[in-house]
């Protein structure tokens, strides 16, 4: 699917409408005008990044039925909201169905999502499965339940996708999730592995997409506040948060504050891989490498300092650098669906 176009006239002025409705027909103050302008810019930025990711990885094709997995958190709400708006001006036709898995966690507000989805007119399916009791029975007290819960949830959602005739399963992972996963796998797993923007599921029957792959979490936080989504708490199961992932989140946010451009460059690096300069013999034939006598401009310059080592290059959220040609950027489980 080609990335849907976003422009000043077509972009949704959600903030402007909200403020205008709130203030009747009176003229907006300068502050309100500025807020409306900034919020409109926020939507356009998110919509542009989602559209770009969809286009870069051909996430959605004509005739697709996209199953949007809706947890009740800010990310999945934003994903559904933006996909619905992009569909209005997309060059192709595709269907959207929202799916929530009610795992029967104590205190889960069953009415929230059905009421919201009915209000906005989106076809939806609520899958009721008491995985909470299964996890509590199998996992010792005090141990994290996230891994087993994730596997159960994944299997159920794959089955539901088949029953609904969905051709794509959309998950709400964003740019920060991808970078956190990369660091977790490097620091604790000994792997250079991230979270792909598009993949075939482990059962071989589904294609999973991550339309928010280019979007910063801070933008999603602002967008959720602006749109006033009815957020459902994510810790109803009582499980302890993933402390290692929380560490990675804090690390990335600290870098973003102290070293502008560093996190963007990290993300850009995921799409600029040079196998010959890594150490995986499965990716590059080091054993058979011989001098050919033919100059190779991409060959290793051995004793010279790499140009990028100076730290002069800075990247943006779309993966473009100021020290070289602009390139489309890639995306990327510690295993949490």
Curated annotation (Swiss-Prot):
Positions contributing to [4Fe-4S] cluster binding: 146, 149, 237
Domain of life: Bacteria
Catalytic reactions of this protein: cytidine(32) in tRNA + S-sulfanyl-L-cysteinyl-[cysteine desulfurase] + AH2 + ATP = 2-thiocytidine(32) in tRNA + L-cysteinyl-[cysteine desulfurase] + A + AMP + diphosphate + H(+)
Keyword annotations of the record: 4Fe-4S, ATP-binding, Cytoplasm, Iron, Iron-sulfur, Magnesium, Metal-binding, Nucleotide-binding, RNA-binding, Transferase, tRNA processing, tRNA-binding
Pathway as given in its UniProt record: tRNA modification
PP-loop motif, short sequence motif: residues: 71-76
Function: Catalyzes the ATP-dependent 2-thiolation of cytidine in position 32 of tRNA, to form 2-thiocytidine (s(2)C32). The sulfur atoms are provided by the cysteine/cysteine desulfurase (IscS) system.
GO terms, molecular function: 4 iron, 4 sulfur cluster binding; ATP binding; magnesium ion binding; sulfurtransferase activity; tRNA binding
Name by which UniProt lists this protein: tRNA-cytidine(32) 2-sulfurtransferase
Assembly and interaction partners: Homodimer.
SUPFAM superfamilies found in the cross-reference section: Adenine nucleotide alpha hydrolases-like
Localisation: Cytoplasm
Coiled-coil region list: none
Free-text remark on how the cofactor is bound: Binds 1 [4Fe-4S] cluster per subunit. The cluster is chelated by three Cys residues, the fourth Fe has a free coordination site that may bind a sulfur atom transferred from the persulfide of IscS.
Cofactor names: Mg(2+); [4Fe-4S] cluster
EC number: 2.8.1.-
InterPro entries tied to this protein: Rossmann-like_a/b/a_fold (IPR014729), TilS/TtcA_N (IPR011063), tRNA_Cyd_32_2_STrfase (IPR012089)
Species this protein is from: Burkholderia vietnamiensis (strain G4 / LMG 22486) (Burkholderia cepacia (strain R1808))
